[in-house]
Protein backbone atom coordinates (compact mmCIF):
# COMPACT_ATOMS: atom_id res chain seq x y z
CA UNK A 1 0.00 0.00 0.00
CA UNK A 2 2.92 2.32 0.74
CA UNK A 3 4.30 1.79 -2.72
CA UNK A 4 0.94 2.61 -4.23
CA UNK A 5 0.81 5.82 -2.22
CA UNK A 6 4.28 6.79 -3.34
CA UNK A 7 3.47 6.10 -6.96
CA UNK A 8 0.20 8.09 -6.81
CA UNK A 9 1.83 11.12 -5.11
CA UNK A 10 2.25 14.03 -7.59
CA UNK A 11 5.69 15.30 -8.52
CA UNK A 12 7.06 18.30 -6.66
CA UNK A 13 7.87 19.96 -9.97
CA UNK A 14 4.25 19.58 -11.09
CA UNK A 15 2.99 21.03 -7.80
CA UNK A 16 5.31 24.03 -8.04
CA UNK A 17 4.28 24.63 -11.65
CA UNK A 18 0.57 24.43 -10.72
CA UNK A 19 0.84 27.04 -7.98
CA UNK A 20 -1.29 30.07 -8.98
CA UNK A 21 1.54 32.50 -8.36
CA UNK A 22 4.02 30.47 -10.42
CA UNK A 23 1.59 29.72 -13.26
CA UNK A 24 0.45 33.35 -13.55
CA UNK A 25 4.06 34.52 -13.52
CA UNK A 26 4.85 32.03 -16.25
CA UNK A 27 1.94 33.36 -18.32
CA UNK A 28 3.22 36.93 -17.98
CA UNK A 29 6.75 35.97 -18.96
CA UNK A 30 5.49 33.87 -21.86
CA UNK A 31 3.34 36.71 -23.22
CA UNK A 32 6.27 39.13 -22.94
CA UNK A 33 8.53 36.65 -24.75
CA UNK A 34 6.00 36.15 -27.57
CA UNK A 35 5.42 39.89 -28.03
CA UNK A 36 9.19 40.49 -28.15
CA UNK A 37 9.58 37.85 -30.86
CA UNK A 38 6.77 39.41 -32.89
CA UNK A 39 8.31 42.90 -32.68
CA UNK A 40 11.83 41.81 -33.72
CA UNK A 41 11.88 39.33 -36.67
CA UNK A 42 15.62 38.67 -36.46
CA UNK A 43 15.37 37.92 -32.75
CA UNK A 44 12.38 35.67 -33.51
CA UNK A 45 14.42 33.48 -35.88
CA UNK A 46 17.20 33.15 -33.31
CA UNK A 47 14.74 32.27 -30.56
CA UNK A 48 13.05 29.64 -32.74
CA UNK A 49 16.41 28.06 -33.54
CA UNK A 50 17.26 28.03 -29.82
CA UNK A 51 13.89 26.44 -29.02
CA UNK A 52 14.41 23.70 -31.58
CA UNK A 53 17.90 23.04 -30.22
CA UNK A 54 16.65 22.83 -26.63
CA UNK A 55 13.82 20.49 -27.66
CA UNK A 56 16.21 18.23 -29.54
CA UNK A 57 18.73 18.12 -26.69
CA UNK A 58 15.97 17.50 -24.15
CA UNK A 59 14.45 14.65 -26.17
CA UNK A 60 17.85 13.03 -26.66
CA UNK A 61 18.73 13.42 -22.98
CA UNK A 62 15.39 12.02 -21.86
CA UNK A 63 15.59 9.04 -24.21
CA UNK A 64 19.11 8.29 -23.03
CA UNK A 65 18.42 8.80 -19.32
CA UNK A 66 15.06 7.00 -19.23
CA UNK A 67 16.50 3.53 -18.43
CA UNK A 68 18.63 4.97 -15.63
CA UNK A 69 15.75 6.97 -14.22
CA UNK A 70 13.64 3.83 -14.18
CA UNK A 71 16.37 2.05 -12.21
CA UNK A 72 16.63 4.96 -9.74
CA UNK A 73 12.87 5.36 -9.41
CA UNK A 74 12.71 4.42 -5.66
CA UNK A 75 15.36 7.01 -4.74
CA UNK A 76 13.65 9.63 -6.88
CA UNK A 77 10.32 8.84 -5.23
CA UNK A 78 11.85 9.29 -1.76
CA UNK A 79 13.41 12.61 -2.76
CA UNK A 80 10.09 13.71 -4.25
CA UNK A 81 8.33 12.85 -0.96
CA UNK A 82 10.71 15.01 1.07
CA UNK A 83 10.42 17.84 -1.44
CA UNK A 84 6.61 17.67 -1.33
CA UNK A 85 6.67 17.84 2.47
CA UNK A 86 8.91 20.88 2.29
CA UNK A 87 6.60 22.46 -0.26
CA UNK A 88 3.63 21.80 2.07
CA UNK A 89 5.36 23.68 4.86
CA UNK A 90 6.17 26.53 2.49
CA UNK A 91 2.55 26.75 1.36
CA UNK A 92 1.41 26.86 5.01
CA UNK A 93 3.81 29.67 5.80
CA UNK A 94 3.14 31.57 2.54
CA UNK A 95 -0.54 31.54 1.58
CA UNK A 96 0.34 34.08 -1.09
CA UNK A 97 1.59 31.25 -3.25
CA UNK A 98 -2.01 30.23 -3.86
CA UNK A 99 -2.96 33.69 -5.17
CA UNK A 100 -2.43 34.84 -8.79
CA UNK A 101 0.02 37.59 -9.55
CA UNK A 102 -2.56 40.19 -10.51
CA UNK A 103 -4.45 39.74 -7.24
CA UNK A 104 -1.29 39.95 -5.17
CA UNK A 105 -0.21 43.12 -6.97
CA UNK A 106 -3.66 44.67 -6.68
CA UNK A 107 -4.20 43.85 -3.00
CA UNK A 108 -0.78 44.45 -1.57
CA UNK A 109 1.56 46.57 -3.64
CA UNK A 110 3.27 47.87 -0.56
CA UNK A 111 3.34 44.47 1.15
CA UNK A 112 4.96 42.94 -1.88
CA UNK A 113 7.95 45.23 -1.50
CA UNK A 114 8.32 44.36 2.18
CA UNK A 115 7.84 40.63 1.71
CA UNK A 116 10.00 40.44 -1.40
CA UNK A 117 13.15 39.47 0.42
CA UNK A 118 11.45 36.82 2.55
CA UNK A 119 9.64 35.29 -0.40
CA UNK A 120 12.79 35.37 -2.51
CA UNK A 121 14.72 33.62 0.22
CA UNK A 122 12.05 30.99 0.65
CA UNK A 123 11.61 30.36 -3.07
CA UNK A 124 15.36 30.24 -3.56
CA UNK A 125 15.67 27.69 -0.81
CA UNK A 126 12.95 25.54 -2.28
CA UNK A 127 14.44 25.93 -5.74
CA UNK A 128 17.89 25.02 -4.48
CA UNK A 129 16.47 21.98 -2.71
CA UNK A 130 14.67 20.79 -5.81
CA UNK A 131 17.61 21.70 -8.05
CA UNK A 132 20.08 19.83 -5.86
CA UNK A 133 17.88 16.74 -5.92
CA UNK A 134 17.49 16.88 -9.69
CA UNK A 135 21.20 17.57 -10.13
CA UNK A 136 22.11 14.50 -8.11
CA UNK A 137 19.77 12.35 -10.17
CA UNK A 138 21.11 13.79 -13.44
CA UNK A 139 24.72 13.28 -12.35
CA UNK A 140 24.05 9.66 -11.47
CA UNK A 141 22.27 9.21 -14.79
CA UNK A 142 25.19 10.75 -16.70
CA UNK A 143 27.67 8.53 -14.91
CA UNK A 144 25.64 5.41 -15.64
CA UNK A 145 25.11 6.33 -19.31
CA UNK A 146 28.76 7.29 -19.80
CA UNK A 147 29.92 4.05 -18.25
CA UNK A 148 27.59 2.01 -20.44
CA UNK A 149 28.72 3.84 -23.58
CA UNK A 150 32.40 3.36 -22.76
CA UNK A 151 31.88 -0.34 -22.11
CA UNK A 152 29.97 -0.71 -25.36
CA UNK A 153 32.69 1.13 -27.30
CA UNK A 154 35.42 -1.00 -25.81
CA UNK A 155 33.52 -4.21 -26.60
CA UNK A 156 32.80 -3.11 -30.19
CA UNK A 157 36.39 -1.98 -30.80
CA UNK A 158 37.71 -5.22 -29.39
CA UNK A 159 35.38 -7.24 -31.61
CA UNK A 160 36.35 -5.26 -34.71
CA UNK A 161 40.06 -5.61 -33.98
CA UNK A 162 39.60 -9.32 -33.42
CA UNK A 163 37.77 -9.72 -36.76
CA UNK A 164 40.26 -7.58 -38.69
CA UNK A 165 43.19 -9.39 -37.18
CA UNK A 166 41.79 -12.83 -37.95
CA UNK A 167 43.17 -15.12 -40.61
CA UNK A 168 39.97 -15.09 -42.65
CA UNK A 169 39.96 -11.27 -42.85
CA UNK A 170 43.61 -11.27 -43.87
CA UNK A 171 42.84 -13.77 -46.63
CA UNK A 172 39.94 -11.61 -47.85
CA UNK A 173 42.11 -8.48 -47.81
CA UNK A 174 44.87 -10.29 -49.68
CA UNK A 175 42.36 -11.53 -52.27
CA UNK A 176 40.96 -8.03 -52.81
CA UNK A 177 44.49 -6.66 -53.20
CA UNK A 178 45.34 -9.30 -55.80
CA UNK A 179 42.07 -8.66 -57.65
CA UNK A 180 42.76 -4.92 -57.86
CA UNK A 181 46.35 -5.47 -58.96
CA UNK A 182 45.29 -7.98 -61.63
CA UNK A 183 42.53 -5.66 -62.88
CA UNK A 184 44.95 -2.75 -63.19
CA UNK A 185 47.44 -4.92 -65.07
CA UNK A 186 44.72 -6.14 -67.45
CA UNK A 187 43.56 -2.58 -68.11
CA UNK A 188 47.13 -1.51 -68.90
CA UNK A 189 47.59 -4.57 -71.11
CA UNK A 190 44.41 -4.42 -73.20
CA UNK A 191 43.84 -0.64 -73.05
CA UNK A 192 47.26 1.00 -73.42
CA UNK A 193 48.07 4.44 -72.09
CA UNK A 194 46.69 7.39 -74.02
CA UNK A 195 48.91 10.22 -75.22
CA UNK A 196 47.81 12.47 -72.34
CA UNK A 197 48.63 9.77 -69.78
CA UNK A 198 52.00 9.15 -71.43
CA UNK A 199 52.79 12.86 -71.15
CA UNK A 200 51.83 12.87 -67.47
CA UNK A 201 53.97 9.78 -66.81
CA UNK A 202 56.91 11.41 -68.58
CA UNK A 203 56.62 14.55 -66.42
CA UNK A 204 56.58 12.61 -63.16
CA UNK A 205 59.82 12.53 -61.17
CA UNK A 206 60.30 9.38 -59.17
CA UNK A 207 61.58 10.01 -55.63
CA UNK A 208 63.03 7.81 -52.94
CA UNK A 209 60.16 8.14 -50.47
CA UNK A 210 57.73 5.28 -50.11
CA UNK A 211 54.30 6.33 -51.31
CA UNK A 212 51.40 4.93 -49.32
CA UNK A 213 48.91 2.97 -51.40
CA UNK A 214 45.46 4.57 -51.66
CA UNK A 215 42.43 2.87 -50.17
CA UNK A 216 40.36 0.29 -52.04
CA UNK A 217 37.58 2.81 -52.70
CA UNK A 218 39.99 5.33 -54.26
CA UNK A 219 41.62 2.60 -56.36
CA UNK A 220 38.21 1.36 -57.51
CA UNK A 221 37.13 4.85 -58.59
CA UNK A 222 40.45 5.47 -60.35
CA UNK A 223 40.20 2.12 -62.14
CA UNK A 224 36.67 2.90 -63.35
CA UNK A 225 37.70 6.35 -64.61
CA UNK A 226 40.79 4.95 -66.32
CA UNK A 227 38.75 2.19 -67.94
CA UNK A 228 36.16 4.60 -69.34
CA UNK A 229 38.73 7.10 -70.60
CA UNK A 230 40.93 4.54 -72.33
CA UNK A 231 38.00 2.63 -73.79
CA UNK A 232 36.57 5.84 -75.19
CA UNK A 233 39.91 6.77 -76.79
CA UNK A 234 40.27 3.27 -78.24
CA UNK A 235 36.73 3.28 -79.62
CA UNK A 236 37.30 6.74 -81.06
CA UNK A 237 40.48 5.54 -82.76
CA UNK A 238 38.63 2.56 -84.24
CA UNK A 239 35.86 4.78 -85.57
CA UNK A 240 38.43 7.02 -87.23
CA UNK A 241 40.19 3.98 -88.72
CA UNK A 242 36.89 2.66 -90.09
CA UNK A 243 36.19 6.07 -91.60
CA UNK A 244 39.64 6.26 -93.21
CA UNK A 245 39.53 2.72 -94.62
CA UNK A 246 35.99 3.23 -95.90
CA UNK A 247 37.12 6.36 -97.70
CA UNK A 248 40.09 4.48 -99.14
CA UNK A 249 37.77 1.70 -100.34
CA UNK A 250 35.44 4.21 -101.99
CA UNK A 251 38.42 5.97 -103.58
CA UNK A 252 39.77 2.67 -104.95
CA UNK A 253 36.32 1.78 -106.27
CA UNK A 254 36.05 5.19 -107.90
CA UNK A 255 39.43 4.72 -109.59
CA UNK A 256 38.47 1.22 -110.73
CA UNK A 257 35.21 2.49 -112.23
CA UNK A 258 37.10 5.27 -114.01
CA UNK A 259 39.53 2.72 -115.48
CA UNK A 260 36.67 0.50 -116.64
CA UNK A 261 34.89 3.49 -118.16
CA UNK A 262 38.08 4.63 -119.86
CA UNK A 263 38.68 1.14 -121.27
CA UNK A 264 35.12 0.94 -122.61
CA UNK A 265 35.26 4.36 -124.29
CA UNK A 266 38.62 3.74 -125.95
CA UNK A 267 38.23 0.08 -126.92
CA UNK A 268 37.59 0.96 -130.58
CA UNK A 269 40.11 3.82 -130.93
CA UNK A 270 43.47 2.12 -130.98
CA UNK A 271 45.15 -1.03 -129.76
CA UNK A 272 47.88 1.05 -128.16
CA UNK A 273 45.39 2.85 -125.97
CA UNK A 274 43.80 -0.47 -125.08
CA UNK A 275 47.20 -1.85 -124.22
CA UNK A 276 47.94 1.23 -122.06
CA UNK A 277 44.64 0.85 -120.27
CA UNK A 278 45.29 -2.85 -119.74
CA UNK A 279 48.69 -2.00 -118.28
CA UNK A 280 47.05 0.45 -115.89
CA UNK A 281 44.48 -2.14 -114.89
CA UNK A 282 47.19 -4.75 -114.46
CA UNK A 283 49.24 -2.39 -112.25
CA UNK A 284 46.11 -1.70 -110.21
CA UNK A 285 45.60 -5.46 -109.82
CA UNK A 286 49.23 -5.99 -108.75
CA UNK A 287 49.09 -3.10 -106.28
CA UNK A 288 45.90 -4.41 -104.74
CA UNK A 289 47.32 -7.95 -104.48
CA UNK A 290 50.41 -6.61 -102.75
CA UNK A 291 48.26 -4.61 -100.32
CA UNK A 292 46.72 -7.87 -99.09
CA UNK A 293 50.07 -9.68 -98.91
CA UNK A 294 50.30 -11.51 -102.27
CA UNK A 295 52.75 -10.92 -105.10
CA UNK A 296 51.91 -12.59 -108.43
CA UNK A 297 53.68 -10.32 -110.94
CA UNK A 298 54.61 -13.36 -113.00
CA UNK A 299 51.00 -14.05 -113.95
CA UNK A 300 49.78 -13.35 -117.46
CA UNK A 301 48.24 -9.95 -118.13
CA UNK A 302 46.30 -10.48 -121.26
CA UNK A 303 43.02 -8.64 -121.82
CA UNK A 304 40.80 -11.43 -120.51
CA UNK A 305 42.84 -11.82 -117.34
CA UNK A 306 42.95 -8.06 -116.82
CA UNK A 307 39.17 -7.74 -117.15
CA UNK A 308 38.46 -10.64 -114.79
CA UNK A 309 40.95 -9.38 -112.23
CA UNK A 310 39.65 -5.82 -112.41
CA UNK A 311 36.11 -7.04 -111.88
CA UNK A 312 37.36 -9.21 -109.00
CA UNK A 313 38.91 -6.11 -107.42
CA UNK A 314 35.64 -4.20 -107.84
CA UNK A 315 33.57 -7.07 -106.42
CA UNK A 316 35.87 -7.44 -103.41
CA UNK A 317 35.92 -3.71 -102.71
CA UNK A 318 32.14 -3.42 -102.99
CA UNK A 319 31.74 -6.45 -100.73
CA UNK A 320 34.01 -4.84 -98.12
CA UNK A 321 32.07 -1.60 -98.41
CA UNK A 322 28.76 -3.45 -98.06
CA UNK A 323 30.02 -5.28 -94.97
CA UNK A 324 31.17 -2.00 -93.42
CA UNK A 325 27.77 -0.41 -94.08
CA UNK A 326 25.87 -3.36 -92.58
CA UNK A 327 28.14 -3.32 -89.52
CA UNK A 328 27.59 0.42 -89.17
CA UNK A 329 23.79 -0.01 -89.30
CA UNK A 330 23.89 -2.61 -86.53
CA UNK A 331 26.12 -0.40 -84.36
CA UNK A 332 24.04 2.77 -84.19
CA UNK A 333 21.10 1.58 -82.12
CA UNK A 334 19.62 4.54 -80.23
CA UNK A 335 20.98 7.29 -82.48
CA UNK A 336 18.71 9.95 -84.05
CA UNK A 337 16.43 8.91 -86.90
CA UNK A 338 18.26 10.95 -89.55
CA UNK A 339 21.49 9.07 -88.78
CA UNK A 340 19.58 5.78 -89.07
CA UNK A 341 18.17 6.85 -92.42
CA UNK A 342 21.59 7.80 -93.76
CA UNK A 343 23.12 4.52 -92.59
CA UNK A 344 20.29 2.47 -94.12
CA UNK A 345 20.61 4.41 -97.38
CA UNK A 346 24.34 3.65 -97.34
CA UNK A 347 23.58 -0.07 -97.07
CA UNK A 348 21.10 0.11 -99.97
CA UNK A 349 23.56 1.94 -102.24
CA UNK A 350 26.38 -0.45 -101.30
CA UNK A 351 24.12 -3.39 -102.19
CA UNK A 352 23.24 -1.83 -105.56
CA UNK A 353 26.90 -1.27 -106.47
CA UNK A 354 27.80 -4.79 -105.35
CA UNK A 355 25.03 -6.21 -107.57
CA UNK A 356 26.38 -4.29 -110.57
CA UNK A 357 29.87 -5.78 -110.31
CA UNK A 358 28.72 -9.18 -109.08
CA UNK A 359 26.52 -9.79 -112.14
CA UNK A 360 29.08 -8.51 -114.68
CA UNK A 361 31.55 -10.97 -116.20
CA UNK A 362 33.20 -8.50 -118.63
CA UNK A 363 33.43 -4.80 -119.39
CA UNK A 364 30.96 -5.17 -122.26
CA UNK A 365 28.14 -6.02 -119.87
CA UNK A 366 28.55 -2.68 -118.07
CA UNK A 367 26.98 0.27 -119.87
CA UNK A 368 28.14 3.87 -119.62
CA UNK A 369 24.97 4.86 -117.78
CA UNK A 370 25.54 2.09 -115.23
CA UNK A 371 29.11 3.23 -114.61
CA UNK A 372 28.05 6.89 -114.31
CA UNK A 373 25.31 6.02 -111.81
CA UNK A 374 27.81 3.90 -109.84
CA UNK A 375 30.20 6.85 -109.62
CA UNK A 376 27.36 9.10 -108.46
CA UNK A 377 26.37 6.57 -105.81
CA UNK A 378 29.97 6.29 -104.63
CA UNK A 379 30.16 10.07 -104.21
CA UNK A 380 26.88 10.10 -102.25
CA UNK A 381 28.12 7.20 -100.11
CA UNK A 382 31.30 9.10 -99.29
CA UNK A 383 29.33 12.16 -98.17
CA UNK A 384 26.83 10.14 -96.11
CA UNK A 385 29.60 8.06 -94.56
CA UNK A 386 31.46 11.23 -93.58
CA UNK A 387 28.31 12.62 -91.94
CA UNK A 388 27.64 9.45 -89.92
CA UNK A 389 31.26 9.00 -88.83
CA UNK A 390 31.59 12.67 -87.89
CA UNK A 391 28.46 12.35 -85.76
CA UNK A 392 29.91 9.30 -83.98
CA UNK A 393 33.20 11.08 -83.32
CA UNK A 394 31.84 14.47 -82.24
CA UNK A 395 28.80 13.39 -80.21
CA UNK A 396 29.54 11.58 -76.93
CA UNK A 397 28.93 9.45 -74.97
CA UNK A 398 29.17 6.50 -77.29
CA UNK A 399 26.62 3.93 -76.19
CA UNK A 400 29.22 1.18 -75.90
CA UNK A 401 31.09 3.15 -73.19
CA UNK A 402 28.51 2.74 -70.41
CA UNK A 403 29.29 0.64 -67.36
CA UNK A 404 31.70 -2.29 -67.06
CA UNK A 405 32.23 -3.86 -70.45
CA UNK A 406 34.49 -6.38 -72.13
CA UNK A 407 35.10 -7.33 -75.78
CA UNK A 408 33.93 -10.75 -76.84
CA UNK A 409 32.87 -12.60 -79.96
CA UNK A 410 29.30 -13.81 -80.03
CA UNK A 411 28.70 -17.46 -80.91
CA UNK A 412 27.36 -16.72 -84.41
CA UNK A 413 30.21 -14.34 -85.16
CA UNK A 414 32.78 -16.78 -83.84
CA UNK A 415 31.41 -19.61 -86.01
CA UNK A 416 31.18 -17.31 -89.01
CA UNK A 417 34.76 -16.14 -88.60
CA UNK A 418 36.05 -19.72 -88.30
CA UNK A 419 34.07 -20.74 -91.39
CA UNK A 420 35.35 -17.73 -93.30
CA UNK A 421 38.96 -18.67 -92.56
CA UNK A 422 38.40 -22.14 -94.03
CA UNK A 423 36.23 -21.31 -97.05
CA UNK A 424 37.11 -17.82 -98.31
CA UNK A 425 40.12 -16.79 -100.33
CA UNK A 426 42.53 -14.04 -99.22
CA UNK A 427 40.92 -11.63 -101.68
CA UNK A 428 37.43 -11.98 -100.19
CA UNK A 429 38.26 -12.46 -96.50
CA UNK A 430 36.02 -10.27 -94.36
CA UNK A 431 37.16 -8.02 -91.52
CA UNK A 432 36.81 -9.34 -87.98
CA UNK A 433 34.06 -7.88 -85.86
CA UNK A 434 34.13 -7.77 -82.06
CA UNK A 435 31.28 -7.12 -79.72
CA UNK A 436 31.60 -4.77 -76.82
CA UNK A 437 28.87 -5.70 -74.38
CA UNK A 438 27.97 -3.16 -71.71
CA UNK A 439 26.30 -3.89 -68.40
CA UNK A 440 22.53 -3.23 -68.32
CA UNK A 441 22.98 0.42 -67.39
CA UNK A 442 20.89 3.13 -68.98
CA UNK A 443 22.71 5.19 -71.60
CA UNK A 444 22.10 8.58 -73.10
CA UNK A 445 21.46 6.81 -76.45
CA UNK A 446 20.80 3.23 -75.42
CA UNK A 447 17.62 4.18 -73.54
CA UNK A 448 15.87 4.64 -76.88
CA UNK A 449 16.59 1.12 -78.05
CA UNK A 450 15.83 -2.26 -76.65
CA UNK A 451 19.31 -3.60 -77.36
CA UNK A 452 22.09 -1.62 -75.67
CA UNK A 453 24.95 -3.72 -77.05
CA UNK A 454 26.89 -2.70 -80.14
CA UNK A 455 29.80 -3.91 -82.21
CA UNK A 456 32.94 -2.09 -83.22
CA UNK A 457 34.63 -3.15 -86.46
CA UNK A 458 38.33 -3.54 -86.11
CA UNK A 459 39.00 -3.26 -89.84
UniProtKB/Swiss-Prot annotation:
Keywords: Acetylation, Lipid droplet, Membrane, Phosphoprotein, Ubl conjugation. Residues 412-431, 444-459 have a biased composition (Polar residues). The modification N-acetylalanine is found at residue 2. It is found in: Membrane; Lipid droplet. One of its GO terms (biological process) is cellular response to glucose starvation. Residues 412-459 are annotated as: Disordered. Acylated; primarily with C14, C16 and C18 fatty acids. It holds the Pfam family Perilipin. The modification Phosphoserine is found at residue 215. Signal peptide: none annotated. Transmembrane segments: none annotated. One of its GO terms (cellular component) is cytosol. Its main location: membrane. InterPro entries: Perilipin (IPR004279). Interacts with IRGC. Structural component of lipid droplets, which is required for the formation and maintenance of lipid storage droplets. This is Perilipin-2. The lineage of its organism: Eukaryota, Metazoa, Chordata, Craniata, Vertebrata.
